Amino acid sequence: MKIAAVYEAVTRSIIAELEQGAAPWVKPWKGGNCIGILPANAITGRCYSGINIPILWHAADVHGYPTNAWLTFKQALDKGAHVKKGEKGTQIVFTKRVTVEKGDTDEEKQISMLRAFAVFNVAQVDGFDAPDAAAAPPPPAGAVIEFAAATGADIRHGGDKAFFVPSVDFIVLPDPESFESVEYYHATKLHELVHWSGHKTRLDRDLNNRFGTNAYAAEELVAELGAAFLCAHLGVQGQLRHAGYIDSWLSLLKKDERAIFTAASKASAAADYLRAFSEQEEEAAE
């Protein structure tokens, strides 16, 4: 499948979900066997990233796959297994760095190019010992608290709104008891931490956009996806803040088929950036 067709197919699928009032990156970590599980390659164990996360979550949800482990046709063959007759793969993408000549000069530069390929859920494969399909064990009660503390973010409580203030570099959250559940509080905290990661002293995303603009909607999409990725990583079953942004996301995606890919890439970078703080603490403690 050509990459332009992948852009179109993925964006069309997400638009269809949003028009039904649902966000396709929410349900897989909110219920079912995929709770707390990021999609990963069944052979290498490596988690997928960027747009591939919601693509594979959505595919697992739609088809009712009991696990979020995937592999390529060749990987199945190499293990002496085979894809079941009639099964169709799920198209995902990877970024390949290629070197090209710069104009008429001898200078070279590297550019990123997307390539599409198909993967199959292990439930679509015969002769392969699938990993345990059980849901991930619940995280320690204080996992999100420890995760947030490790970042060093200035988080304050008060009022009835959640937001990040780039000019003074702090997060404001309502008191925990103001939320419908502790999970909703944690999911909201993770959403704001993704915004925090975009500060000019960190990942330097543009955070000074007016409400109602496409740029504002794009940053909210980054925060929403990043929070979903982190909720899966930490095993949080909560409620994301997508409802109020659906109309603006629809407008954004209908104008730009690449917008969801860009947002997912930035969300993955933000999640990786935030996870690194906890990983550094763990390494220091060893």
Task: Describe the function of each predicted region.
Residues 1-286:
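N-terminal accessory/interface modules of nucleic-acid-binding and processing proteins
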